[in-house]
Every structure is written in structure tokens, then in C-alpha cells.
Amino acid sequence: MGQSVVVLGAQWGDEGKGKIVDLLTEEIGAVVRFQGGHNAGHTLVINGKKTVLHLIPSGILRDDALCLIGNGVVISPAALQKEIAELETSGVEVRSRLKISPAAPLIMPYHIALDQARERAAGGKAIGTTGRGIGPAYEDKVARRGIRIADLHYPKQLEELLRTALDYHNFVLTNYLKTDAVDFQKTFDEALAFGEYVQPMKSDVAGILHDLRKQGKRVLFEGAQGALLDIDHGTYPYVTSSNTTVGGALAGAGVGADSIDYVLGIAKAYATRVGGGPFPTELDDEIGQGIRDRGAEYGASTGRPRRCGWMDIVALKRAVAINGISGLCITKLDVLDGMEKLKVCIAYEYNGKRTEYAPLDAQGWEECTPVYLEFPGWTENTHGITNWDDLPPAARAYLRSLEELAGCPISIVSTGPDRDHTMVLQDPFA
């Protein structure tokens, strides 16, 4: 039987999953995206060249990797076509290697209009979405009025589905959100054109995955966002609209629990968050700004500055538990170079008591005060180090402490953005 590894974020997203997926895709059978949409921004740096992927799996830069988009992903036709065109212009063959589930829902123009209008109306209480229609597309999926890849090849059915959806959404847009309606004919024509474009890539992704496992091939499941943004397990309502945890890999790709052999959780050596929502260890000071500047903490999809803070072990332990994480990958260790001291949150003060468990609601998280353990920093440069013994003693001690506090071994350490700036302590596929 083949080996399957799930790579997912163990914080609030932006942990560096794309680089690690690319690193692990050597001699891979396939890489599959299973949730989210083009709100993801996976940045790869190979030989100094930077590539940002939003929808297409990060394995696309490996010539022999099959890339799959599962039924759990919501697809923007315009974003997908743009990303394919950019990659192929740079010499990367995409369409012959990309397979898309016909059950994947589409992000339609009215989803984008709804997303942006709602955020404007919410004002200071906005969730902080990317405004790209992700949430409304998932809403339609659950409400059974979504339009899927498969529907594009049945014009009469598509017309009926689209008219029904627009009757509903245009009423909300014009009467409640006080914005413009979305035009039926333009939307219909664009959908038909995309149907022709995507037809050669439409495939039974679940079937492909089952066959690859029987053939003994390696498969990597690439998560987007992070576990603490999960619609069920995150800081609701400040969450994304899909299951970013390991269960999302099963449902969003169409495989059983026995198809997963290893879960790799990606976490920065500190913590970041984009948009609204609780963040107990946030540093709204010059230390936080310094981390932001050194770590280039600006969104790959939106360019928004990320909120920065100390490592939160309480939150990380929750991610480890709900995902059954087998091993951790700690990224951006080099960003902490030169800091005199480091802090790690090991517990919260909540309702007058100390707890090592995170609350289950956003308001509870907001009321938590972090309890810190302090560690000495290091003055040496760790950028690009690929050997554990070459790390400064204080950096090694910091990592070993994270490992012990989280109750999970560290399998990989990343010391820079390039594919080669990595040390693999234990290969997840070994």
C-alpha cells in the first residue's frame, strides 16, 4: 500500500505549508488540495525564485507530480485560469497534470459581491475575510443551491440553477445590502465558457487517490489556512468556512481514515494571525513589529500585515489533539535571530483560574491572559542552516522545549524561505 501524509497548519494559517509541501513532493505520486479556495496563498522559493500559488497544489513545480483538486475546494473560474496562465507562461506545464473533481463547487460573481458587501456592512465587526466569495460559496454548497463543476456541462440545468441562485442572491444584494444586482446573461456565458475550458481537467479525484494507494504511490494532502481557523474547531465566528483540520482531508478528497498514515502540523517558531479574532499572545509593540518586518509577515493573497505574537503552546496543543498530529514542522526559526529573550505561552488565566485548555468560543479566548515561560534568545545567524548540530545551543534548547511542551516530536525545521533552507529530522514518508 502507498503512504499518505496530510500537511496542515497548526496555528491561524500562513505557517509555511507551501514550502514544506514542495519539499516533500520529491518522488510523489500526487498532491491534493482538499479545502479552501483562492484565499490560500502558498509561497514557494526555489533557487531564489518566488512563486505564490492560491488554488493549484504546491506540487505543480515538481515535473512528475500529479496535482489534484478535491470536492472540498471551492473554485473561482477566473482565479484558476489566471493561475494556470501565469504558471504556463513561466514554463510550468499545468493542464496535463491537473485533475479537478466534478463535485467541486464554483465561486460565482454573486458570491464575491455578497462577501464584499457584507464586510462593508459589518464595519468594525467584520470577520476580515479576503472578500473573494469563499464563505458565500460554501453557504450555497450546504444550502444545496451551489453550482458545481459537473453542472457546467448541462446548459439547461445550469441555466435553471443560475436563475434560482440569482433570484435569491440578487434580492439580498439589492434590498438588504443596498448594492448592485449581478447580471444573469454575463454570468451564464462566463460559466459556459469555463465549462469548456475545465472539461479536459475534470476527473474522479477520489478514484484516482484510491488507485494510487493500491499502486503503492505516495500521496500528499495539502491543507490551506490553519487548524485554529476551522469552521468547527476554530475561534468561531472568526474562522474560515471549511474544515481545515484532518477530517477535512478525508471528506474533501474522498478517502477513508485508513488512507492517512501521517499528519504533519506546520507551526511558526512564533505566532501570527490575519484579520479579526482573538490572539492571546499578540505583540502590539516594537517587538511584534520587529517580528513582522524580519519575517515579511504580509499576506501572500491580500498583502495585509499579519498580527504577530509569541508562540502559544495552549493553542498548539489543541491543534495537535484535534488533528492527531504525528510530528511538527517549525518554520521561520531564523526570524527570531538576535532577540535577547523569547517567551512561550504555556497556560492562560481565565475566569480567575489558570488553565492549559483553550476556551471553545471566541469571547472566551478574548478574556484569556497568557502565562509565559521565558527562554534565552541567541545572537547567532540560523538562516539557511540545514544541520541540527550547527544550530546555536539556545535555538536547539528552544526547539526541544517546544517539542516537550506541545507533547509532539519535531520532524522538520525550516530556517529560511528557500526549499533548501530546511533540516529534516524525521521524514514523514519514512
Curated annotation (Swiss-Prot):
Pathway: Purine metabolism; AMP biosynthesis via de novo pathway; AMP from IMP: step 1/2. This is Adenylosuccinate synthetase. GO terms for molecular function: adenylosuccinate synthase activity; GTP binding; magnesium ion binding. Its main location: cytoplasm. Homodimer. GO terms for cellular component: cytoplasm. Belongs to the adenylosuccinate synthetase family. Substrate binds at residues 300-306.
